[in-house]
């Protein structure tokens, strides 16, 4: 399941991020790419050793932790390996698939990838995120503060930025439920039961759906 979520960041959070990143040091993005992805990665990213990195990470993780739609759709166990990436004119990231595990010796699984956009789509040309699927390609270029989440198993790329600067946060989520089809099934169930609760309160139908949801999560969750 591919999902876009609007207004993940408040305007205040977005401004704080942009202000901090404008003064922070960036380094070659190849340092965090897998051995094969290094061949096609041409970006710079926020230096993890800088004072700004922890501040930026805290802002983003706070925003993600409070987003109910993200929690329902992804069932996060751990949000990890955040990268603050900048694409200047001429930069791109060729077709690749994300590593199955990240975090060095921690071995955190990457079930879901996300891109959180920090710059307006009108402020740069090119730089589209392209997700390569069996049925064709899907192209995304979202508003600042919005994000896209998608299974980490997909090939994807970022087209060349031909003018301006593309600034994004990318990261990965280890889900309580690793199978994407099972996550989508649970998301649909959760959406329906919440809709019923809004209309009818704690009805018999709501209780039955909640029982089914809880038992499937118990069965599929890890």
UniProtKB/Swiss-Prot annotation:
<dbReference type="InterPro" id="IPR041097">
    <property type="entry name" value="PKHD_C"/>
</dbReference>
<dbReference type="GO" id="GO:0006879">
    <property type="term" value="P:intracellular iron ion homeostasis"/>
</dbReference>
<dbReference type="InterPro" id="IPR005123">
    <property type="entry name" value="Oxoglu/Fe-dep_dioxygenase_dom"/>
</dbReference>
<dbReference type="InterPro" id="IPR044862">
    <property type="entry name" value="Pro_4_hyd_alph_FE2OG_OXY"/>
</dbReference>
<keyword id="KW-0560">Oxidoreductase</keyword>
<feature type="binding site">
    <location>
        <position position="156"/>
    </location>
    <ligand>
        <name>Fe cation</name>
    </ligand>
</feature>
<dbReference type="GO" id="GO:0006974">
    <property type="term" value="P:DNA damage response"/>
</dbReference>
<dbReference type="GO" id="GO:0005506">
    <property type="term" value="F:iron ion binding"/>
</dbReference>
<dbReference type="GO" id="GO:0031418">
    <property type="term" value="F:L-ascorbic acid binding"/>
</dbReference>
<dbReference type="GO" id="GO:0016706">
    <property type="term" value="F:2-oxoglutarate-dependent dioxygenase activity"/>
</dbReference>
<feature type="binding site">
    <location>
        <position position="96"/>
    </location>
    <ligand>
        <name>Fe cation</name>
    </ligand>
</feature>
<dbReference type="InterPro" id="IPR023550">
    <property type="entry name" value="PKHD_hydroxylase"/>
</dbReference>
<dbReference type="InterPro" id="IPR011051">
    <property type="entry name" value="RmlC_Cupin_sf"/>
</dbReference>
<feature type="binding site">
    <location>
        <position position="166"/>
    </location>
    <ligand>
        <name>2-oxoglutarate</name>
    </ligand>
</feature>
<keyword id="KW-0223">Dioxygenase</keyword>
<keyword id="KW-0847">Vitamin C</keyword>
<feature type="binding site">
    <location>
        <position position="98"/>
    </location>
    <ligand>
        <name>Fe cation</name>
    </ligand>
</feature>
<feature type="domain" description="Fe2OG dioxygenase">
    <location>
        <begin position="78"/>
        <end position="175"/>
    </location>
</feature>
<keyword id="KW-0408">Iron</keyword>
<dbReference type="Pfam" id="PF13640">
    <property type="entry name" value="2OG-FeII_Oxy_3"/>
</dbReference>
<keyword id="KW-0479">Metal-binding</keyword>
<dbReference type="Pfam" id="PF18331">
    <property type="entry name" value="PKHD_C"/>
</dbReference>
<dbReference type="InterPro" id="IPR006620">
    <property type="entry name" value="Pro_4_hyd_alph"/>
</dbReference>
<protein>
    <recommendedName>
        <fullName>PKHD-type hydroxylase PCC8801_2196</fullName>
        <ecNumber>1.14.11.-</ecNumber>
    </recommendedName>
</protein>
